[in-house]
């Protein structure tokens, strides 16, 4: 199907946005959480305390459908294929607590979330990030289309640390 002029415009807005943007599919996470509810799980926090390995399992259920150019730049990838092949290097360690908070929001029926965390570039450099996601209105029943924005706040966090250190002594 040929693209419309408006479609080209919105694709360019996504592709050239000056912030890391991701299109993701959380339908696998929705199925996982729905099955937990159906099995009688009433409290996700209690369940995750008893089964912490499930946090990693749900991370693997995220499907990344597209990222923009700034995402490649931020994470040091040359291509989307390279980036997607290395997600386990980028989202690790401190990310689990961050993701747990996101899972809790999803469990509680929230369609958008924001929070700070740590991701890693492909070269291993840590990035302090502010992550925002929104399940798009047309996908609120399936969670198949989620827009994710990642802002690099490393310089801000370093400045905050220097500021706090000024007043320690």
Region annotations inferred by a language model:
Residues 122-126, 131-146:
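Short loop/turn elements at sensory-signaling interfaces that couple input to output
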Residues 69, 73-75, 81-94:
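PAS-family sensory/regulatory domains
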Residues 1-13, 151-165:
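PAS-associated C-terminal cap
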Residues 26, 100-105, 115-119, 133:
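A short beta-strand signature of PAS-family and PAS-like sensory folds
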Residues 30-31, 37, 45-48, 61-65:
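Conserved hydrophobic beta-strand signature of PAS-family and PAS-like sensory domains
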Residues 24, 148-151:
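PAS-associated C-terminal
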Residues 25, 34, 41-44, 68-71:
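N-terminal capping loop/helix in small sensory signaling domains highlighted by a polar->aromatic N-x2-3-F motif
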Residues 65, 97, 113, 120-127:
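PAS-family sensory domains
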């Amino acid at each position: 199907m040929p693209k419309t002029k408006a479609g080209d415009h919105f694709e360019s807005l996504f592709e050239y946005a000056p912030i890391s943007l991701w299109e993701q599919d959380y339908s696998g996470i929705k199925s996982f959480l729905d099955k937990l509810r159906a099995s009688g799980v009433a409290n996700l926090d209690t369940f995750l305390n008893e089964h912490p390995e499930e946090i990693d399992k749900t991370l693997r259920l995220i499907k990344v459908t597209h990222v923009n150019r700034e995402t490649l730049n931020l994470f040091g990838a040359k291509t989307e294929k390279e980036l997607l092949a290395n997600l386990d290097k980028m989202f690790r360690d401190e990310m689990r607590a961050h993701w747990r908070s996101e899972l809790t929001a999803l469990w509680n029926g929230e369609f958008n979330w924001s929070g700070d965390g740590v991701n890693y570039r492909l070269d291993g450099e840590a990035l302090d990030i502010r992550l925002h996601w929104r399940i798009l209105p047309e996908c609120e029943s399936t969670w198949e289309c989620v827009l994710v924005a990642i802002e690099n706040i490393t310089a801000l966090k370093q400045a905050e640390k220097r500021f706090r250190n000024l007043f320690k002594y």
